């Protein structure tokens, strides 16, 4: 005689970014109930934004979250040049048989996760209005993935130091698939 006891866990995730969606999908795959709270934003999604991802992370994402192989652009060769010496090549990474890493468009993985989550009976999107402690008492775990959330501002804002003294260059690369 075997009795199977199933613990029903309910998780609250704050924020609707790529991290929160991937986490929600991984939990839903384990049949854990997830409510994802989001704030309505009037920002446009940058369709040219890409993410670099290593082979081991691709394998993990495919196994635990969702298959992203069709979205990937493999990178087998990387060359780094310097502006100071007439565009002289200073570093070169190359691997003929394996990919160094891959890139994918942020918007594509974001949209795929939303579509898959909406199909699950274990997942709900909920609009975040105002923090009330009583709204969160029914959850076994609350995960905050949104640095702009009022809970973060209330309890952790003095803990973060921000120094954005960096420069980033971006480009759109045409290549054969």
Question: Model-derived features: where do they sit?
Answer:
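Conserved N-terminal helical subregion
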Residues: 59, 63, 73-156, 161-167
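N-terminal glycine-rich dinucleotide-binding loop that anchors FAD/FMN and/or NAD(P) in oxidoreductases
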Residues: 49-72
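Glycine-rich FAD pyrophosphate-binding loop
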Residues: 12-14, 26-48
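Flavin-dependent oxidoreductases
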Residues: 167-177
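A generic structural signal for short, well-ordered alpha-helical segments in conserved domains
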Residues: 24-25, 114
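Beta1/beta-strand and adjacent pyrophosphate-binding region of the FAD-binding site
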Residues: 9-19
